[in-house]
From Swiss-Prot:
Xref: InterPro entries: Lgt
Key word Isomerase present: no
Residue positions binding a 1,2-diacyl-sn-glycero-3-phospho-(1'-sn-glycerol): 133
GO molecular function, one term: phosphatidylglycerol-prolipoprotein diacylglyceryl transferase activity
Originating organism: Ehrlichia ruminantium (strain Gardel)
Protein name: Phosphatidylglycerol--prolipoprotein diacylglyceryl transferase
Protein encoded by which gene: lgt
Transmembrane segments: 10-30, 50-70, 86-106, 112-132, 169-189, 197-217, 227-247
């Protein structure tokens, strides 16, 4: 499989699929959150600046997370490389933490209920995850392990001609499309949204479990490899922590019904 990672080129300007995924995902979230915000969780004034807060949280968190979790030694040796975002290197877990922090500050600033805001936003986030994984697939990165199944594909970036799991597509479906359906079914057809933070915990647990198991068929990052027992990757460790935190918050939420 070999698809040009550049979606559009105008003179010296190159627009990559990965950049388009971010842009479309953010614009969709902005539109969708306003559409489903029937109880006016966000104020009209807050909507004017929310995109800048999202972008700041995702970029800072995603980049810092990647540096700390996946390639710290390299960036300590070549610190200027930290700022070369166009070369890639973002972490979902880092971006999630960055968004969590910026949204907390944002909600304090505009006097918005934090967990209600997070619940609302997470109804749209899976679409961004879906688009991001499709971009990973187009770029031929984050491919899976060698397989003999009929789902196998050849990724030129792997440096060999073995058939491999298209793990990006597995993630696009289970972490993206299916999670979007689940989150919105719960939001529209159950009383879950009445309990602040409940959708947040469901998102954390779902994503963490799915990511943990898909990592078994995904090739580990070459610069990190396995970090525990020769079969646990960094992505699995972070996802496991995500699940544990989600379960803990869920228990607190059920006890208090209002975090």
């Amino acid at each position: 499989m070999n698809i040009d990672p550049v979606a559009l080129k105008i003179g010296l300007l190159e627009i990559r699929w990965y950049s388009l995924a971010y842009i479309i995902g953010i614009l969709f979230a902005y539109w969708y959150v306003q559409k489903i915000d029937k109880y006016k969780v966000f104020t009209p004034e807050s909507y004017k600046s929310i995109i800048s807060w999202w972008v700041t949280g995702m970029i800072l968190g995603g980049r810092i997370g990647y540096i700390l979790f996946y390639n710290l030694n390299f960036y300590m040796s070549f610190p200027i490389e930290m700022f070369k975002l166009w070369k890639g290197g973002m972490s979902f877990h880092g971006a999630s933490l960055g968004l969590f922090c910026t949204m907390y500050i944002f909600c304090k600033k505009y006097k918005i209920k934090f967990l209600s805001a997070i619940d609302l936003c997470l109804c749209a986030v899976p679409v961004g995850i879906f688009l991001g994984r499709i971009a990973n697939f187009i770029n031929g990165e984050l491919y899976g392990k060698v397989t003999n199944t009929r789902f196998g594909m050849i990724f030129q970036n792997s440096g060999d001609f073995f058939y491999r799991h298209p793990s990006q597509l597995y993630e696009a479906f289970f972490e993206g499309l299916l999670l979007f359906v689940v989150m919105n079914l719960l939001f529209f057809f159950t009383k879950v949204k009445s309990y602040q933070g409940m959708l947040f915990t469901i998102f954390m647990i779902w994503y963490g479990i799915v990511r943990f198991f898909i990592e078994f068929v995904r090739e580990p990052d070459v610069q990190v490899g396995y970090i525990l027992f020769n079969w646990i990757t960094m992505g699995q460790l972070l996802s496991f922590i995500m699940v544990i935190l989600g379960i803990c918050i869920l228990r607190l939420s059920r006890m208090s019904h209002n975090i």
